[in-house]
Amino acid sequence: MMKVLVVVALLVTHISYSSSEGIDDLEADELLSLMANEQTRKECIPKHHECTSNKHGCCRGNFFKYKCQCTTVVTQDGEQTERCFCGTPPHHKAAELVVGFGKKIFG
């Protein structure tokens, strides 16, 4: 039993050491790329805001990324234009409701 514990301890130490070396190996280009992704995430379009010009730029909600939902609007002049907003699709709303209900029941 003692041998098993020693082997497990050695494996855990080796794995943690290997993962820390991987973090140190990140190059400057990769760090800049990660920072750019973070900046893009901050510039996403919030829920209920217009996304007509950037249909893939909606932010993330609690569980899912918001989807750009479009409708055709007819102006008083009779022109049809497409208007889009970031929102939660009905099937995502249902999933969030079930998860929220499950969290209330099971803690």
From Swiss-Prot:
Primary location group: secreted
Disulfide linkage: C44-C59, C51-C68, C58-C86, C70-C84
Keywords: Disulfide bond, Knottin, Secreted, Signal, Toxin
Signal peptide: 1-20
UniProt KW Membrane keyword: no
PROSITE patterns, sorted: SPIDER_CSTX
One CC-aspect GO term: extracellular region
Record localization: Secreted
InterPro entries the record matches: Spider_toxin_CSTX_knottin, Spider_toxin_CSTX_Knottin_CS
A Pfam family assignment: Toxin_35
Tissue: Expressed by the venom gland.
Entry's Gene Ontology molecular function annotations: toxin activity
Residue ranges listed under propeptide: 21-41
Domain notes: The presence of a 'disulfide through disulfide knot' structurally defines this protein as a knottin.
Similarity field: Belongs to the neurotoxin 19 (CSTX) family. 04 (U1-Lctx) subfamily.
The protein, known as: U1-lycotoxin-Ls1b
